[in-house]
Amino acid sequence: MHTLSRREFVKLSAAAAAGLTVLPGFRFGLDQLPAPMTRTFGKIGFEVTTLGLGGQASLQWTPPDVDPVPIILKAFKMGVNYFDTSNLYDASQLHFGKAFRKLNLIPGEEGYDEKLRESIFLTTKTHQRWGKPGFPELENVNNWSNGDPAGGAVVDLKRSLSQMFGDGNGNYPEGSYVNMVLTHNLNFQEEVDVMYKGLETPINKDENFGVLVTLRDFRDGTNLTGLNPKNEKLIRHIGLSGHINSPAMINMIQRDRWEILDAMLVAINSNDRLYLNHQHNVIPVAQAKNMGIIAMKVFSDGAMYSKYANWTRDHEGVIRTVGTRELPSKPLIEYALTTAGIHTAIIGIGQIADDNLKCQLVQNYYAAQVKPGGLSIKRRQEIEESTRMVKDGKTNYFQLPFQGLTPPQNVSLKQKDQVEIHWDTAYAANTPLSHYEVLRDGKLVGKVKHEPQVSRDPFTFADQEKGKSYRVVSVDQDGNRAEAEELQA
């Protein structure tokens, strides 16, 4: 049987996506698809396919005429190896569990396919910020779960294992694990403070502590928290996810002195730069730490098309078509995957079809066959222009509004034998940050190149000659400037 070359496959599917005529009756089987492209998943080292299967769309909000299990099985058959779900995605984990039984992925059962299990990367999420029950209600600290919202992170973790590998009632077989747990949907700085309790502060087993030190126990098989008395190793990696607040996500990464965070799931699409964007803010920080980076919200949760620009409420909000003639889906996927630092993109599937030219999964698969530098800057700008007026540019309801280039944060001054000026990163607007200028008594005395600030160690400039006043200015690659307040020496 002839296997379609990548070029043949892309040309054929591109024609269909553009609404052009394809020979009547032409079909190609899944065994004719070119092998999926992969990228090294940051410091995790796993060779991840550029397309991952998202656990929402019809896996969460299942239309009456859709069975989610064949969607998962088809993704496996096509060679997709990254799978995403969450404890907030309704029955999504249960659907994965049904598919895993058909694929012999249940440890301890006859025919368990350990090789297949090792070939995939399975991620779930917890929106619990605390490790165990009995936590205070704090402003801007949300603890949500479709299971027990008051149960803490361990309850969520074991719920995931039970739903995907066990009986769905809290039990799971020995040998069960998830490749990664992400802290779900980081929105506020206050949540970061809670999640680092027990790391930045001593562990007090009589009190509560954050999700990170808790998950670390179940990654390493330790029992520092007292929550893992069997010394189970149930997860292999820990990460974070977020769509709203790049500064909070930067803070989460910077505070990780223990190298706990291996990956980040982040919203990225062609309208990103209309908002407080991620591609020039948190993504470079995660990339500088060699984290695995997963793209989501490639189609703005469907708002690039016919869906309302708000959180999906039910199956009526699930998109079940492949792009439109006016706005093909392929360039939007290519945009996300050519954003510097991105390794894979998870995309939810509304439906699959026997006609591969109309199948969301197949069409997303071919669109994801793009190299990291596969689009020119000009082409990326053209894609941005094609979407900037969709819903008047208000597609990314899940993202903080545009605020422009900011001054450096937390500027301070110390005097001893010399003057030392310290500051934290500015936040970029449309263009990446370039450098910082230091002014003494209104005159330029130094420049400091911007680098992603990967820790809480600040930028520093030392001045041997003492002046009366100092100011630090952030400058982006277009020459835009933002001045911090003047400090008196």
Indicate residue ranges for each PLM-predicted region.
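Recognizes extended acidic, P/S/T-rich segments that occur
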Residues: 435-465
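Active-site mouth loops of central-metabolism enzymes
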Residues: 54-65, 126, 136-152, 316-324
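Beta-strand-rich modules
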Residues: 461-479
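Glycine/proline-rich, positively charged
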Residues: 142-270, 287-294
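Structured C-terminal cap/extension of enzyme domains
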Residues: 257-260, 281-417, 422-434
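N-terminal binding-site loop/beta-alpha segment at the start of enzyme catalytic domains
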Residues: 2-121, 130
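Conserved, mostly hydrophobic/aromatic
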Residues: 41, 53, 83, 122, ...
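Extracellular fibronectin type III
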Residues: 477-489
